[in-house]
Structure formats: C-alpha cells, structure tokens
A protein has these predicted regions:
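Short, basic/glycine-rich phosphate-binding loops at helix/coil junctions
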Residues: 17-20, 105-119
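Short, well-ordered beta-to-alpha junction loops that form the rim of enzyme active sites
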Residues: 55-57, 82, 113, 152-157
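Loop-to-helix element that buttresses phosphate recognition and phosphoryl-transfer chemistry
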Residues: 6, 12-62, 119-133, 176
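Active-site-adjacent alpha-helix immediately C-terminal to a catalytic or transition-state-stabilizing loop
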Residues: 2, 61, 133-191
C-alpha cells in the first residue's frame, strides 16, 4: 500500500511580481496568483487527501483554501513553519534591482541562490534543508500512523529540499529547480 503526498507552491504574490525578496514577509496573492491557486485546485480535484499542511504566511493559507474547496474529505489542516519560505533576513522587502545596485550582481547571486551562504541575518538553502528534512521525517511518521494522504501548500525554496529528498537529487540539481506557481508534485510513501 502507498500513501500520497501532493506538494505545491503558493500562487504568485505582489512581492514575486515586483521582484522583491519576500522570505518571511507576508505578501498577498496577485490576481494571477489567485488564478494559479485555482489551476492547482483544478489539477488536484480528482486526488484524495485527508490532511493538509500550510505555513503561517497568507500566501500558503490562501492557496490551500482554493485547493480545499474540492476536498471535503480533508478534515485536518496543520500549520507547520518548518516548510516556510527561506528567510532572506535584512534583504526582505528590498527589490532585486536595489540589492544588485548596492552590492553587485555577483553578491546578489550568492545571497539569492547559494546553498551554503545565508543572506545577512537570513538563512541559506542548507539551513532550510535541515528544517525541511526534520519536517519530512515527522510527516512520514504522521502519514503512516494515520494512514492518510496529504497536501502541502509550500514555498519555492522549501520545496527545493523536499524535492531533493523524494527525487534523490544532488545539491546542484536541487539548486537548479524552478518550482511553478500553478502545478503540483506527487510522491508516494510505502506503508
């Protein structure tokens, strides 16, 4: 027997649209982001899951709300910030252009996409991976104990280590991933 995980990224936010470092700042879904959430909901409408996970950020919660409209069987919604977006620390709220202008493209790229280097007072992807792996360990226990399929409304950078784990990717492969706003990934857990 297999249990299923359906993981998806929240829809586009205003900070995403404006190319700002969002991180742990709360940025609402744009009209396109709402359409993204509806597309995910439509693509998942024939799947079954009894529990769903979200983070405390409205973009995760709001995307999940659209998905859950098709899933009356989902009785448990759990907020778990181990799947929250990467903290960009002092960069949060700043536009990419501003950071490039102030620190240069090379430093921007290091802070934006480096595995090992955190942004000032923020997290590296390596740090995000550590908390996501703890979440995965507990998630698998939860699923097996309760015999449930789950949906996870996540974030672009928390999905990277999640996908690395289930797709058995290298760090390099993980860092090249782009997670779409309007689709989901499905993984199986053997019980």
């Amino acid at each position: 027997m297999y249990l299923k995980i359906y993981i998806f990224r929240h829809g586009q936010t205003y900070y995403n649209k404006l190319h700002r470092f969002t991180g742990w700042k709360d940025s609402k879904l744009t009209p396109r982001g709402i359409q993204d959430a509806k597309k995910i909901a439509n693509r998942l409408k024939n799947k079954k899951f009894e529990a769903a996970f979200q983070t405390r950020l409205s973009r995760s919660k709001d995307t999940l709300k659209y998905v859950l409209k098709n899933h009356p069987e989902c009785k448990k919604i759990i907020t778990d910030d181990r799947m929250i977006e990467r903290s960009y620390g002092n960069l949060q709220g700043n536009s990419h252009k501003t950071i490039i202008k102030k620190f240069g493209k090379k430093q921007f790229d290091i802070w934006h996409r480096s595995y090992n280097t955190p942004s000032p007072k923020g997290e590296s992807i390596k740090m995000v991976e550590k908390r996501v792996n703890l979440f995965i360990k507990d998630l698998i226990k939860f699923m097996k104990k309760n015999k449930v399929n789950v949906a996870i409304s996540a974030h672009g950078n928390s999905m990277r280590p999640f996908r690395k784990y289930f797709e058995e990717l290298t760090i390099k492969q993980m860092m090249q991933l782009e997670n779409p706003y309007d689709n989901y990934f499905e993984y199986k857990i053997k019980v």
